[in-house]
Amino acid sequence: MSSYAIVEACGKQMWIEEGKFYDFDKLPFSKGDVFSLSDILLVKMDDSAEIGQPYLTDKYSVELRVLQHFSGPKIRVYKMRSKKKTRKTFGHRSKLTRVLVQSISKKGVAQTTCFM
């Protein structure tokens, strides 16, 4: 198994691995931008694991590249009061950003990147 990390982004904690893509709530970056996450909770590399208390910001970095912005699936909500003629339907589509995890690396060590 390759290295993985548990990071906190957009108010959620996510398990991420190198070379895979994930969907986050809309991020303020353009398509193709590369950025790094600062809230890293846990990192597992090869045979060692490190847990932050609460974060590993100064030891590790996670590089991500924005692939695209898109709308998520449509969520439909139907409200009704029984025995009344009150009915209401509404819904929404969340704005999402798809990112590719390029590398999970220790700071100060040569970075390995994933080419896709």
UniProtKB/Swiss-Prot annotation:
Subcellular location: Plastid, Chloroplast
Any one biological process term the GO annotation gives: translation
Keywords tagged on the record: Chloroplast, Plastid, Ribonucleoprotein, Ribosomal protein, RNA-binding, rRNA-binding
Single GO cellular component term: chloroplast
InterPro entries (alphabetical): bL21-like, bL21-like_sf, Ribosomal_bL21
UniProt xrefs under NCBIfam families: L21 (TIGR00061)
Family the UniProt entry places it in: Belongs to the bacterial ribosomal protein bL21 family.
Protein name: Large ribosomal subunit protein bL21c
Source organism per UniProt: Emiliania huxleyi (Coccolithophore)
Gene: rpl21
